[in-house]
Swiss-Prot record:
Superkingdom of source: Bacteria
Single GO MF descriptor: ribulokinase activity
Pathway it works in: Carbohydrate degradation; L-arabinose degradation via L-ribulose; D-xylulose 5-phosphate from L-arabinose (bacterial route): step 2/3
Protein name per Swiss-Prot or TrEMBL: Ribulokinase
Sequence similarity: Belongs to the ribulokinase family.
Keywords, sorted A to Z: Arabinose catabolism, ATP-binding, Carbohydrate metabolism, Kinase, Nucleotide-binding, Transferase
Gene of this entry: araB
SUPFAM superfamilies noted in UniProt: Actin-like ATPase domain (SSF53067)
Provenance organism: Shouchella clausii (strain KSM-K16)
Amino acid sequence: MKRYTIGIDYGTESGRAVLVDLENGAEVAEHVTPYAHGVIDQCLPDSGRSLEPEWALQHPGDYLDVLRLSVPKVVEIADISASQVIGIGIDFTACTMLPIDKHGDPLCFDPQLAGRPHSWVKLWKHHAAQDEADEINRIAEERKEAFLARYGGKYSSEWMVSKIWQIFNEDPDMFEKADAFLEATDWVVAQLTGTIVRNSCTAGYKAMWHKRDGYPDDSFFAALDPGLAQLTTTKLRGDILAPGQRAGGLTAEMAETLGLKPGTAVAVGNVDAHVAVPAAGVVTPGKMVMVMGTSICHLVLAKEEREVEGMCGVVEDGIVPGYFGYEAGQSAVGDIFAWLMKHGIPADLKQEAEQAGKPLHSLLEEKAAAYRPGETGLLALDWWNGNRSTLVDANLTGLILGYTLQTKAEELYRTLLEATAFGTKKIIDAFRDSGVEVNVLYACGGLPQKNELLMQIYADVTNLEIKVAASKQTPALGAAMYASVAAGDEAGGYETIFAAAEKMAHTKARSFKPNHENVRLYQALYEEYSKLHDYFGRGENDVMKTLKQLRSRAKGGAVHA
């Protein structure tokens, strides 16, 4: 009898369940449930209370809808029996967090509290805790806290402690009412099993936890505010388990809702980008996974913990048990290309695409591919949404150098592709300079599936082979793979993620190999990129920040330094 697991990938706008064949990793069925409430960034449901700028909330009931609708649907589509499903795995955006009561229910489920914004789920892109993040960084730097170096020198406004402190500052009564603060991935797992456990991925990358040292000392949290002194032993308490461990079994009530068997194994929760690493076939050091979409998340495994300039985090057992998982990233990649499509393409080129019956991006790719490296005469800094790694500075902005009256849209397009590749090379260089090996690249996500020119440019700029994941749903596949490990080999799953990856993870037959002539030409361009990178990014010329300040003053707002 065939065995299957279900991976459930919770995104920003919807959740997707994928049923996976354990024998070969085939994605047999999938179903998407859009979130009924979407991203709540204007006003609260029901009460209509307006939200301040930079807020981004969600309704936890939407997450339950994904379970209730999508899980039974994939079983129905595949026409299999419940007994053939031996495990469930979850991945989620992060840090997406919520306050819960002593029964494990979200505080926003209480009608008395639903009209207060801090009772709701704070989505990963909730940026209203910037003041708290700034103070965390200032105090941590003053105290020389060890955790700060593991985050590339800066703790983000998107992460757990920043968001908790915002709740404490703006609604102290809500802070007191919260029995605990959970990552949404851990809350969904708790709904399935009836037991709350935390995962080492989000605890490490988002909540200051370290496998050997634990959380920072209580004195650090007391330095933030005396009321936070016991935070980690009270509202962040709980067992922290590694990816692939069994969080528990499906409760009888939830089994009935999902149409599965009670006791079905449920894996510890995970994060969407990180869980994609084994799904791309990477379970050993020396290989960098690029999760490529609107932005890029760069993930690397290593045997040792090292400080890498501008990394977003390094966590032991954070991605694959037994290794340190490193994370870095670029704040905008696909979003930059989308910006050009929206604002930088002349009407005649759009008309040409229509007449040829081609998508606009396909025509641009075709035209841009005709140029050799350096032939456009242009160079760009890929900072349209700031710089995440390695400079960790959200107030940097984009730059294009070399315009002439003859510059064409396809030349701009190619230049922006190249700029993002140079940004990735900067990250690779930072890892190598710190002693972390990167010898081959693996790509997954939306971009590698539809832009071959981009992939070839990345191979040429980095002088590395790029292998592309066969799956279009790597997060869900990775969650399903970890579900197979949680179920174990006796149930028909796998003993380790290494064994699961050998059978379930695949790359496409075609890889992208560096063109040696292009490598030589791009090295010269990269040297010029590096000059611009350091000149504008390391403080020699702060014109980008000055322009943002002037723009803000003109609009009557403020900019965080």
